[in-house]
Regions:
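Glycine-rich phosphate-binding active-site loops on the catalytic face of alpha/beta enzymes
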Residues: 28-30, 91-102, 144, 151-167
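Generic structural signal for well-ordered alpha-helices
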Residues: 10-18, 42-53, 78-83, 123-127, ...
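Structural preference for beta-strand elements that scaffold enzyme active sites
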Residues: 23-25, 62-66, 91-94, 137-140, ...
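Active-site beta->alpha loop and helix N-cap motifs at the rims of alpha/beta catalytic domains
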Residues: 1-25, 30
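Short beta-strand/loop segments at the ligand-binding rim of alpha/beta enzyme cores
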Residues: 1, 55-73, 129-141
Length: 167
């Protein structure tokens, strides 16, 4: 984060990175970055999506851009993100990053909660976004995956791909 304005940061990063990978992830979900999750609110999310797509077009790039979504969003945010994603042909959503809900673990821990405690919440978001987008947006399922059964569960709920951090 070099500037106050996220769009300036994303522009700098996109122009440096778009030739180097197979896809780009815009992580709007980190619980450790103050204010970052505010970018999942509809007006902010739409600005980011349209800005990134404009940058991609200006650079004659076809690189897929995926957006990592927080598990700690409201039902309205889910609907708004789904509608914006459909209207703007978003390449995919990564569901989900760590949660700030510590009800299932020691509440004194700092940072976000991941691993097994995130599994059910991640699955809920996968199911909801798959339904809200009628399966038209690719979903990468992540969170609480420990074995093949966990992978199958996420795929049955609508995940197209799976991402595993550590198990």
């Amino acid at each position: 984060k070099d500037t106050i304005e996220i769009l300036d940061d994303l522009k700098k990063l996109f122009e440096r990175l778009y030739r180097l990978g197979d896809y780009i992830v815009i992580n709007l979900s980190s619980p450790n970055t103050p204010g970052l999750r505010d970018n999942l609110k509809s007006q902010n999310f739409e600005k980011i999506v349209t800005s990134i797509h404009r940058l991609r077009d200006e650079n004659n790039s076809k690189i897929p851009v995926l957006f990592k979504i927080s598990p700690d969003i409201s039902e309205q945010d889910k609907k708004d993100i789904s509608l914006i994603s459909l209207a703007n042909d978003v390449d995919g959503l990564i569901l989900t990053n760590t949660t700030i809900n510590k009800s299932m673990v020691n509440k004194k821990l700092e940072g976000g909660v991941s691993g097994r405690p995130l599994f059910l919440k991640s699955n809920e978001l996968i199911r909801d976004f798959y339904t809200l987008t009628s399966g038209k947006i690719k979903i990468i399922g992540v969170g609480g995956i420990f074995d093949a059964d966990d992978i199958l569960t996420k795929m049955k709920l609508g995940a197209s791909l799976i991402q595993i951090y550590s198990s």
